[in-house]
Amino acid sequence: YRYSTGLSFIYPDYHPAATSGDSLRLLFEFNTSDLLFVNNDSAATGSYAISFALYKDMESKLIVDSGVRYFTCSKPLEEGFRLRGAIDVVAPDSFNYFMRLDFSDLNRNQAVTDIIIIDRTGIQSPDKFLLVDAYTNAPLIRNFSDRPTNVRIVQNSDTKRPVFMRYFKTDYPIADP
């Protein structure tokens, strides 16, 4: 879910990835053309911040973990470059969480709020698996790809268990999973 108080120019994508029993790595990605870059002494730089608050459930007022991370980046040479990063969060296993994320462009003084649900229950939780590009090993954070991509499914957690998948191929004209 995404919320903005006015016209929004920022469209970040997030993906929670469980790393161990009490740790979660929040992967984020956005297009650098969404940021406002200002000229400093030698180069154009963009500044942004991501603040987060992790709640036990939607109606809870108890915050499990929270924080703000500040970032600065130089303007890339190519247009449409997607910048990636990660934030480590404390999220004990066996709960479903509700996370509020505020992505702020500090040069433009504009923010957009996203809300994501994090599933940390069961051994087949979707947050314990990550889809990566087979050639570059870069995580695929968005739910779609703009080009044909070979992918691998990797398990994020420390314990290595077999992964069971069901794959359906039908003649109905729907894209394969």
Where are the model-predicted features located?
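Intrinsically disordered, low-complexity terminal regions enriched in Ser/Thr/Pro/Gly
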Residues: 1-177
